[in-house]
Amino acid sequence: LVDSINSYWMSEYKIDGFRFDFTKGFSNTPHGTEDPWGGNYDAARISLLKRMADEIWARNPLAFVIFEHLAVNSEEKVLADYGILLWGNLNSNYAEAAMAYHDNGKSDFSWINYKKRTWNDPHVVGYMVSHDEERLAFKCYTWGNSMDDYIIKDTTIALKRLTMNALFFFTVPGPKMIWQF
């Protein structure tokens, strides 16, 4: 059914790609309480998702195939190496950087880089915020750190911190997802 719907949209409306939500849920493998979100490596799911991508690429070899997968890196690497783009959620890390909380690597956003993940191609669609997370500005205004008279809860300072975040975000190689509300 998914294949026929994708095919129809591609031929009828000239859609040039698809983004699938929560693809780690595209599985028939039962996941117990030790893995309630199904994030562990699942070879059967990989086969299914590759088949779906192949069906899309059979109709348009240049079509974009994007997954919000968010599973273990070993599984995402297989999909990325196959040519699939994958969501890269770095909301928490960019928020910690904007709020100036750096202890224990909380503000380390290097995971947005495909090389850090040991992927062969820049197939991380990195993002700082989406509809699933709280806005970074709100976090700065509510929980921003302070150092003497440098108060991140201050609007001017918070916006400068968010500008700095954007500079770091856009300089990392690879595609980006920019969410606007």
Predicted regions, residues:
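Substrate-binding/active-site clefts of carbohydrate-active enzymes
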Residues: 1-41, 52-60
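Conserved alpha/beta catalytic core and glycan-binding cleft of carbohydrate-active enzymes
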Residues: 14, 47-181
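Acidic-and-aromatic substrate-binding clefts and catalytic sites of carbohydrate-active enzymes
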Residues: 26, 43, 72-74
